[in-house]
Design a protein with these regions (language model features):
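Short alpha-helix in the Rossmann-fold core of NAD(P)-dependent oxidoreductases
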Residues: 89-93, 112, 131
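Conserved catalytic-site region of short-chain dehydrogenase/reductase
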Residues: 82, 117-129, 153-158
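Substrate-positioning beta->alpha
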Residues: 98, 159-160, 179-200, 207-211
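NAD(P)H-binding glycine-rich loop region in Rossmannoid oxidoreductase-like domains
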Residues: 40-98, 102-105, 117-121
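Mid/C-terminal beta-alpha module of Rossmann-like enzyme folds, strongest
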Residues: 199-262, 276-309
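N-terminal Rossmann NAD(P)H-binding glycine-rich loop of SDR-like oxidoreductase domains
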Residues: 6-28
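Conserved beta-loop-beta element that borders a ligand/cofactor-binding pocket
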Residues: 115, 135-157
């Protein structure tokens, strides 16, 4: 897909990553049709002058209608936790199947699909199992597909960063799982958006799966230290919580709380996290992602405001 007049269907356009992807595609002169759930149709994208298609990836008919007249699709929809009818199976598997079917029906050949770093590594969680099923659906689609597996994505609008900022800003020590040696490889949301925009036009990436992470590999302890230093201008103390105790607490909270601080699956994913080799993506897309701390410093004011600090 190289025509400047091409229209791109973007699912998840109102989300954290979607907001940046849509802005990047429009900056590069591409027309965007945003698939937006009816309860979000009056937020953000409409004010930006986007073409809105109301629908839900779980509803095949609405996705099929949204895909008509498009030449490419970027599928970004995903959830980290299940809520009611928004289950991993419904959103990741059924939703991706509906997007693939809609692309086929509408003659959309190019599909760039967002998965997650850790998919395909055998981590036994509902999140990763369904991400892997979604990847299989894309690979078997017959389309010109590219799969992108980002690590933790950071930016001032992201719920993860907002919650982490609030955590380090609380009074008292920052709690760690064990010694806090779990690994993060944060990648900036604007670099992820740039990568998606390049992938749409770079057909050499078709049929490939790319792990995408930032250049810095941080322990959870060092991640918190960086947040405190940049956002608060000071160091924080830590409280190491034994992993078995965290595991037991997560299990109990999952059974008694509607929105627990951490779920057993999330804890398993954190414990199983491993860094990725960033070289294949850097070679394919022609750039290195930005380092974490200077980028965080550049948007620190926005993040403080978003977190209410």
């Amino acid at each position: 897909m190289s025509e400047s007049t091409a229209k791109v269907l973007v699912t998840g356009a109102t989300g954290f990553v979607g907001h940046s992807v849509v802005a990047r595609l429009r900056q590069e002169g591409l027309a965007v049709r945003a698939l937006v759930r009816p309860d979000r149709a009056r937020r953000g994208p409409e004010a930006e002058g986007l073409e809105i298609a109301e629908g839900d990836v779980r509803d095949a008919a609405s996705v099929a209608e949204a895909a008509r007249g498009c030449q490419a699709a970027v599928h970004l929809v995903g959830i980290l936790r299940e809520h009611g009818e928004q289950t991993f199976q419904a959103v990741h598997v059924t939703g991706t199947g509906n997007v693939v079917a809609a692309c086929r029906s509408a003659g959309v050949r190019r599909l760039v699909h967002m998965s997650a770093l850790g998919a395909g590594r055998g981590t036994d969680t509902g999140y990763f199992r369904t991400k892997e099923e979604a990847e299989a659906c894309v690979r078997q689609s017959g389309l010109d597909w590219t799969i992108v597996r980002p690590a933790v994505i950071h930016g001032p609008r992201g719920e993860f960063m907002i919650q982490m900022a609030r955590l380090v800003a609380r009074r008292g020590p920052v709690p760690l799982v064990g010694r806090g040696l779990q690994v993060l490889q944060p990648v900036w949301v604007e670099d992820v958006a740039r990568l998606f925009a390049i992938a749409l036009r770079r057909h050499a990436t078709a049929g490939q799966t790319y792990d995408v992470g930032g250049p810095d590999i941080l322990t959870l302890r060092d991640f918190y230290r960086t947040l405190a230093r940049v956002l608060l201008g000071r160091e924080k103390r830590f409280a190491a919580v034994p992993t078995p105790l965290v595991r037991a607490g997560a299990w109990l909270a999952a059974h008694v709380a509607s929105n627990p601080p951490v779920t057993p699956d999330e804890l398993r994913m954190l414990q199983a996290a491993r860094p990725c080799d960033t070289r294949p993506a850097a070679e394919a897309f022609g750039f290195e992602p930005a380092p974490f701390e200077p980028t965080l410093a550049a948007y620190a004011g926005e993040l403080r405001a978003a977190a209410g600090l």
